Amino acid sequence: MIRSIEGLRGVAALMVVFFHAFVLARWGGAPAQWGLVQNAWLFVDLFFVISGAIMAMVYGQRLQDGRQVRAFFIKRFFRLYPLHLVTTLTAIGAVIVVQGAKWAAAQAGIQLGGEQPFAVEFFKPSYFLLELVMLQGVGLMTEALHNYPSWSLSVEFWLYLAFAVLFFFVRSTRARVWASAAIVVLCLAHFLRVFSGLGPQVLAPDVHGMPRGLLSFFIGVLVWYGWQAVQPRLRNLSSTVLGAFQLVLAVLSLALIDMRADLGAWVYAIPFVFGLWVWSLLPDRGVVAALLQTRPLQWLGVHSYSIYLVHVTVLTFFDWPGRKFGEPLKYAVVAVFVLAVLLAARCTYRWIEVPWRDRGKRLAGRG
């Protein structure tokens, strides 16, 4: 794994946590007014770009026959599904526990929060069935329930299918690049059609999750092949120059996220800038790469998948104090919430993510 990209993944996961707490859960406070937090959902697109680049790097030469494709799917399934299933169940269970506590308090004449217990729909059997088969984010439902960030997980799962099929049947590098570029162009055309008013106007996962994932994922694939093409000529590029390029792209990426509401159609340039940022980090040296390789960010990167999936369960328990308390006490709640997320992520990483990932590797190796 490229360590700087691992660290970048950790930063992205933490930003999504802040978005869901301050914006989606309506915790408010000063951070909810910052464009970087309001638009932190865009870091999911960065996840897709990173995933495309890493898949092309690791599996570009490994999908040559049916046995290798089978091993790929087994490893991907065991990498994603066990933690997805557990966190879906814990997210549902957390709501039942919290709403049950509110109901019990109401019976004693104590009101916790503004809503009545169980007043908001929190479980839908049809959505749960789609979650079980990883179809909740591909456009079959018009909402995101339960462990709602997992919509992107379902998109990623089917992106792996598209990637494996493409790379199995298309063997030459040139053809793969052209095919990936065609997918990117088609997705971009789809979103420009949306922006022009000819398509669904809500940029939500239920409508646009799959094209959104396809666009960013195959930008990532192109990033890897672009790096492969120029790597021999850039081998002697100084770390100072490379670091300056990384810094410009990091600042540009964060600025575009912050200004998202004012960009108009240029918002669709953000995944391409993400792609350039990831491209600049592939050598794993330079000032930004060094920052992302620090121990705290590496820890976040290693645990990023668990952080991403477990934080909604934790957020459910902190939702009422997060909204009730004003500043500055709110930030004490935020600090405890983040620590609880990191602790929960450590537990799920150690006891669910890693053991099942290793089981998948062993099972894939038997073929």
Regions found by a protein language model. Give the residues of each.
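Functionally critical transmembrane alpha-helices in membrane proteins and complexes, commonly lining
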Residues: 3-62, 81-84, 88, 126, ...
